A protein has these predicted regions:
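Short, well-structured N-terminal submotif of metal-dependent ribonuclease cores
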Residues: 1-40, 53-64, 136-139
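Active-site neighborhoods of divalent-metal-dependent phosphate/nucleic-acid chemistry enzymes
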Residues: 75-116
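A generic structural signal for short hydrophobic patches within well-formed alpha-helices
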Residues: 12, 45, 124-125
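Acidic, PIN/NYN-like endoribonuclease modules and their adjacent C-terminal/linker elements
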Residues: 2, 106, 112-139
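Non-catalytic, surface-exposed connector residues within folded enzymatic/regulatory domains
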Residues: 23-24, 42, 61, 77-80, ...
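Short acidic, glycine/proline-enriched helix-loop-strand junctions
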Residues: 67-70, 74-79, 87, 93-95, ...
């Protein structure tokens, strides 16, 4: 069984937005990892909904519902403990421009033993993870 891969907001935005500079790369990676076990947090799902609300709301609803229904996608729910851990990480890295949702993602990835993320976000690399969209060439 392949290792789980974390889904980040920036990947989903690139996947949905045809004008995004990473759109084709996101499509290619989605095809490459189709059926593989995936991991996402409901905080990321909230971020997806917010980011796509203006221009791609229907597409956001569809992909969020697909993630929630898919057997290969594990959705980690935000608990008070997880929020507190994420906030602690967020506060302790004043030298980084990491967002709170990213910090929560990093905690979840570490606890789940996940090293790869579908993202091009440099913050994941700074935190010691592989940002797959940075490693696979754009087409």
């Amino acid at each position: 069984m392949p290792n789980r891969i974390f889904i980040d907001t920036l990947f989903v935005i690139a996947l949905i937005n045809r004008r995004d500079q990473y759109h084709q790369q996101a499509l290619d990676l989605a095809e490459q990892f189709e059926g593989d076990p995936l991991l996402v947090t409901d905080a990321v799902l909230l971020e997806i909904g917010n980011a796509l609300a203006r221009s791609y709301k229907q597409e956001a609803v569809e992909i969020i519902e697909q993630f929630l229904a898919a057997e290969e996608v594990e959705v980690v729910h935000l608990t008070p403990r997880l929020f507190a851990q994420g906030l602690t990480l967020y506060k302790s890295h004043q030298d980084k421009a990491w967002g709170l949702v990213d910090c929560i993602s990093f905690i979840v990835m570490r606890e789940a033993g996940v090293n790869q993320a579908l993202t091009f976000d440099q913050h994941f690399v700074q935190a010691g993870f592989q940002a797959l969209m940075r490693e696979f060439p754009r087409t």
